[in-house]
Amino acid sequence: QLRTTGSYPLTSVWIMITGERSYERVVAAAEVAPDDYILKPFSSQALFDRMQSAFTRKRFLKPAHLHLMNGREDLAIATMDELVGKATTPVQKLDVLRLLAETHLALEHYNEASKCYSEILDLRVIPWAKMGLARIFKAQDKVAESSELLQDIINEAPHYTDAYDTLAHNLARCGQFAESLEVLEKAVALSPRNFRRLCLTGESALNAGDPAKAAQYLEKAVRIGRNNSAFGPDVLIDLLQAHSEAGNAEKMDQVANELNGILKGEHNVFLLHVCRAMTLLGRKSWMDAQESLKQAAALLLQRQLSWRSGVRFLEAVARLPDDIDGYQGYDWVKQLSLRLVRTHQDVEQLTSMAKKSIILIRAVHDAYGFLQNTNDEAVSLTKDKK
């Protein structure tokens, strides 16, 4: 977690002590490439030698690291371009190319990052380098190419759980929630105490229409994650939804009470209305739930509305009977879709979450059609001016 969040300096050295004898399995277990690793049992001299080697490699990269730590990515990239030519060993070259690729990827320089990862793979076939290419495809909305490469990674390095997460995300983007859940469950079996992955699996089970299974994963996430820095209201909101859909009234009320003490401030008013609606839906109080969703719908144009918050709203609306008095599901979901939809994958994902409601699916498609027509008209006007 410290490594992925950047919570300690790039100049720090991370050495894994492990019983694994395959470098790829070490990398897979760590989900990112360590600076070095040493096998158990080992002597103090062996550890000293490995540490000395790791510090030598870090000193070689220090000029680039310092620029990155000062926020000067441009100078860091120029420095790394020079260091590639100065590398005297394959290991030094691989270290520079890895840092250069990660920097380009963070800056969304996808072509440059892709060239670096490809050059790394020419030196050595390493799972994290393939993972970098898969992330580039994902960022470019090339879902099929990304998924194909991720499946290759999983076949070659079945313990590389990060690849499972990204593949599951790709499947969910295409509305394939059952398949996404299946992939995540395999990853959880490999790393059963990973808080973030348990949350993702619970969310995926909700999207796949299995609230009982979602509750199991989310309850475990809450048990082991309360002291995790990433712990927050999101996992509790998903757990509330799971209990609501599964009809677990007592547990639903317990989670709702906890959320009422957490969701404070104007920026959380939308979620409070949605959570209240979830609780009322769990009791089948349709009219009261609709009123809460109506209050949430009035806030759909808020700038801070996130994709996940919007999806929670959609999933709650999809549980309302469409024949109750004053039903406005179509209007609400169309307005939501106008806010969230950008690509065809967005349409597939939202329509899959509409729980087979013909009215709501039509609302998503109508919004996408309106956006496409507006875009076509804008392009036409631009061409006319030329």
Pin down the residues of each PLM region.
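Short amphipathic alpha-helix used as the core "switch/output" element in two-component signaling
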Residues: 1-9
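Alpha4 helix (beta4-alpha4-beta5 surface) of REC/receiver domains from two-component response regulators
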Residues: 8-11, 20-36
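Hydrophobic/aromatic residues positioned on beta-strands within the core alpha/beta folds
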Residues: 15-17
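Charged, alpha-helical scaffolding/interaction elements associated with membrane systems
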Residues: 32, 69-70, 107, 174, ...
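A Lys-centered signature of the CheY-like receiver
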Residues: 40-41
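Receiver (REC) domain switch/output surface
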Residues: 47-58
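Alpha-helical segment of the N-proximal tetratricopeptide repeat
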Residues: 59-108, 115, 132, 377-385
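Flexible loop/N-cap segments at domain edges
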Residues: 110-386
